[in-house]
Amino acid sequence: MRIGVDYYPEHWDRQLWEKDAQLMKEIGVKVVRLAEFAWCKLEPIEGQYDFKWLDDVIEIFSVRNIEIVLGTPTNTPPLWLYEKYPDAIQVNESGERQFIGIRGHRCYNSSSMRKYTKAIVEAMTERYANNKAVIGWQIDNELDATHCCCDNCTEKFRGWLKNKYSTLENINKEYGNVVWSGEYSAWSQVTAPLGGSPFLNPSYLLDYNRFASDSMVEYIDFQREIIRKNCPSQFITTNTWFTGNLPNFYDAFENLDFVSYDNYPTTNEITDEEELHSHAFHCDLMRGIKKKNFWIMEQLSGTPGCWMPMQRTPKPGMIKGYSFQAIGRGAETVVHFRWRNAIIGAEMFWHGILDHSNVKGRRFYEFAELCREVNKINEEIPDYKINNEVAILYSSDQDFAFKIQPQVEGLYYLQQLKAFHNALIRLGVGTDIINWSESLNKYKVVIAPTLYLTDDNVTTELYRFVEAGGTLILTNRTGVKNMNNVCLMEQMPSNLKECAGVVVKEYDPIGHSIHTIKDEAGKVYQCKQWCDILEPTTAKVIATYNDDFYIDEAAVTVNKYKKGNVYYLGTVFNSDYYIELLSKILDEKELPYYKKLPYGLELSVLENENGKYLMVFNNSNEIKCFEGKHEGKSIIRNELDGKSFTLEPYGIEVLQLVE
């Protein structure tokens, strides 16, 4: 458990390097990330490398026992490369090459880009392989499943399709290309998605996103092999995010040592209740990718803003609180972006720890306090794990398929997952967010929102889970299509209808209209966006619609199947219904939860060989009182706390539990 910073010595005069490193040491910074955007300084002329300045920086930090993560600088190739090898630049959906001088516009499949990627990564790793201060490598920066439409990508996509389908006849059949006379008769007719039209075949678009993700993964592995060969004792990761075309995270990190994530909680006022815990959701998802703790490689440090209007300045407590939020979700190292506000370039208003004035301000002193507290806690909890018995299933394929053909205004795949996650946080229940194809053996409750695409292996595991006594929650838009994004000719939820004990006889995409349902006790709840009109076969109806032509029709059901239960939610709710339903399910499964946890509080239970630790984070701008279940000793203040205590806005407490 440690705190670090992202540092850009190439932006600053040398006299600042020593001062910055010394100040970092004094306040307890343990690690810095360097060089991920510095290609033009490392190779100013093709084939001529200059590592002297980086050697000096590493030495400055090394003598102060601050460890180094080096980034491969391939996100920002130098202009000489783009000028000489324009095929290295991405082509957009209009068939135009992107403008040079902007980051992230390299093509993963360009042979020129691969050639010079290999050269710079070989040179860096050979030089720093035996440098004890360098503990690891970050590959590139914030890669995504870029939809490049250049000739290289088109040719590679054809090869990808040949490997998957063998023949054009098979592609035509699986995609249904007969629609609008879209059948291929020659491989030359297969292109990247030029035009970017939503009228393009949805099966083709889903496959192109898979290809784009695979291209990104291949580029990661291309660099990983070089680094692993030259630096076998140093870790390898890459930093991902939740912007752009999201890749298959599980493929991306399969061969890397751990996940790294760039975490920028909003500093603006949150008016949507369901977005309050959005970044807790992201962190839980990151932990679930490799089922172990992860790093934050970029963490909020100040006012965000560059190519967009600036957001609000972080309120007192936010910098420390959001760092602890990530730690409580499994982030064993939190690296803050950035040490200094840039005074040059496009990111000069994406604020860091030290302002343009170079005067230590409120954010600096809060960051220093964070470093002290994390270093203290690390002495007590040097290694920890998070063990949960509730899981939410995530699939990048589902997410992208939903984006290709939006179902109704307001209904988004990730929001469906976040709604359940938000309710579980409100109940103080820890949740794993895992790949939808994972084994479910360790869980008692599994939530599988919007299984829009149907996979036979996933279906088999879900049946096995329920048959063994697990509780499964399904939602609307389940069992709509096969994995090629083609609609199934059977009643939803298709191959899950036996265990669900229900079929969808009709549906109504209501969008932003508000309807209501009534539960067994006669309590009324609002619903929105989508209404599946359900017809039970063996399931019990536990809520009915209260509006429209389907008044009194089934809205929510539960079915006893073998040793387990399957709930089917035909509509989308506000948090009150999810909280009510999940409370009943948690009672049934004898899982602990908090009935009256104040709004905004987030709980995490950390475990190691010394016992269990409860982290409580007040994710709100109000003082909150926590009513606990166990006595505990405060790790931060080294004193015994009772079961109850108050937290300042964005405040944090860590207790060693006395059970």
Swiss-Prot record:
InterPro entries, per the entry: Beta_galactosidase_C, Beta_galactosidase_Trimer, Class_I_gatase-like, Glyco_hydro_42, Glyco_hydro_42_N, Glycoside_hydrolase_SF
Entry binding sites for substrate: 103, 141, 307
Disulfide bonds: none
Pfam family, one: Glyco_hydro_42M
Temperature-dependence annotation: Optimum temperature is 30-40 degrees Celsius for activities against both pNPAp and pNPGp when incubated 10 minutes at pH 6.0. Both activities completely lost after heating at 50 degrees Celsius for 20 minutes.
Gene Ontology annotations for the cellular component aspect, listed alphabetically: beta-galactosidase complex
TM region positions: none
EC number(s) from the headed UniProt entry: 3.2.1.23
Family: Belongs to the glycosyl hydrolase 42 family.
Protein name: Beta-galactosidase BgaA
Organism (species): Clostridium cellulovorans (strain ATCC 35296 / DSM 3052 / OCM 3 / 743B)
Lineage, top ranks: Bacteria, Bacillati, Bacillota, Clostridia, Eubacteriales
